[in-house]
Structures are given as structure tokens and as C-alpha cells.
Amino acid sequence: MKNIRVTVEYDGTSFAGWQRQSGAIVTVQGEIEVALGKILQEKISLAAAGRTDKGVHARAQTANFFTASSLEPSRIVHSLNSLLPQTIRISNPEEVDADFHARHSAKERQYRYFLIEEPSAIYGRFAGCSFGKLDVAIMQQMAAILVGTHDFSAFSKEDRDNPGRICSVTACKWYPCKHYLVLRISADRFLRSMVRYLVDAMIRAGKGRLSVGDFCRMLETGVTTSQLNPALPAGLFLWDVLY
């Protein structure tokens, strides 16, 4: 059996997330596995670095799968891209060691969130919207507070009783990029919807609706003291994965 690693780029707008689901629900993983099954004539199960939510995109998701096929990885990917919708592209195929796992072998994941201040028919497809001016200095202050190891219980959709809610954030910063304000955040791992909850908290602070003190208390106690909602998925990209 060969272990094949690939990079997956996708526009998540029309997908119900990465993870395969039963029935007729269309997901990125499901589309790729069906196409691989046709090419390789065997049942394929993909592992991925991150299970992105409905509507979330990826610039460089990493995935791997095992196959008994003798086809070269480059031929597999060429055939794969001919079968997949244009909203999914596969690149950088390579055979890797049998113990490589896209999720478990990852050392760091980087996400970026693209934000605009007013709705836009052009720029809004791949962005969240704050619907008003923001105090970026306050948002930058909050981003800096996130660097380090914390319990992110207050910023996740996951069951509060589940263990393993500690994440180590290595970098977090807002920066301007053309029409967007972009959050770049890197960590060893992320909880479900964690980035989108953090973005919503920072937007609220940037509009004067959440204090830095309340934000810090949520981070320290793991208890949400403000009614947070995950920011729109359209602005979020899984940007890179380091091994």
C-alpha cells in the first residue's frame, strides 16, 4: 500500500464542510473520495489536517490516503482534477512514509480571516463583514493577548465537558490587505469554530460592544460572559499546515 499526500484548495461556499456525511449532503471530502474511487477502483478514505465547517475555504489543506494502485501520484491527481468540480483543486502529490497522517503529524496550522467593513457584491464572497468602522487598535490588542497556551472553552462549539480544549497560539495579528482587514492566526490545533468565535469577539470589541477585560475573563475562565456568535464562514481560510 502506498501513502499519498496531497494539497487541497477549495472554495467552500457550496459545500457542507470538509467532513464526509451520509446521504446526499455534498462535502469536500465526499467529492474527492468518490472521484478517487472511480479512478483507483477501490474504496478510499481521506485523512485531513483540518475539518473545516460549512462555507469555510482552504488555500492549502493537507490530506493523505492509502492505495494499492500502481498509478503514479501525478497521474492520480491529473485524473482527479478532471473529475472534480472547479471549486476543488488538488496539487503537490507525493508518496510519503506509511506513518504520515495529515492530522496527527501536523505541528502547526494557520488560518486567515478576511474582513470588510461594509457589504460588497464583489469582495464579499470571500469575506466576513463588520457592518461599520472598527477600532483596529483594540482588536490588535486582543489578538496579542491570544498568543500563548490557553483554554479556549469560551470560544468553541464543542461540548464544554470534553477534555483537550487547550491550544497553543504561536502568532495572531490583524493586518490590512487591499480591500480587507485580515487576521492571521497560527496554533498547534484549533477547536471547532474557534477562529470564527474569536473574530466575532474582536469585531464586538472593535465596535465598543465588548471590553478587553471581559475578553480576558472569558479566556481565563473558559466561560462566555457575552453572547458570541461565530463570524460568517465566508471569510475564513485554512491557509497553511506545517509538518
UniProtKB/Swiss-Prot annotation:
The active site is at D53 (nucleophile). It holds the Pfam family PseudoU_synth_1. Substrate binds at Y111. Its EC number is 5.4.99.12. Keywords: Isomerase, tRNA processing. InterPro entries: PsdUridine_synth_cat_dom_sf (IPR020103), PsdUridine_synth_TruA (IPR001406), PsdUridine_synth_TruA_a/b_dom (IPR020097), PsdUridine_synth_TruA_C (IPR020095), TruA/RsuA/RluB/E/F_N (IPR020094). GO terms for molecular function: RNA binding; tRNA pseudouridine(38-40) synthase activity. One of its GO terms (biological process) is tRNA pseudouridine synthesis. CDD domains: PseudoU_synth_EcTruA. It catalyses: uridine(38/39/40) in tRNA = pseudouridine(38/39/40) in tRNA. Formation of pseudouridine at positions 38, 39 and 40 in the anticodon stem and loop of transfer RNAs. Belongs to the tRNA pseudouridine synthase TruA family. Homodimer. This is tRNA pseudouridine synthase A. It comes from Pelodictyon phaeoclathratiforme (strain DSM 5477 / BU-1). The lineage of its organism: Bacteria, Pseudomonadati, Chlorobiota, Chlorobiia, Chlorobiales.
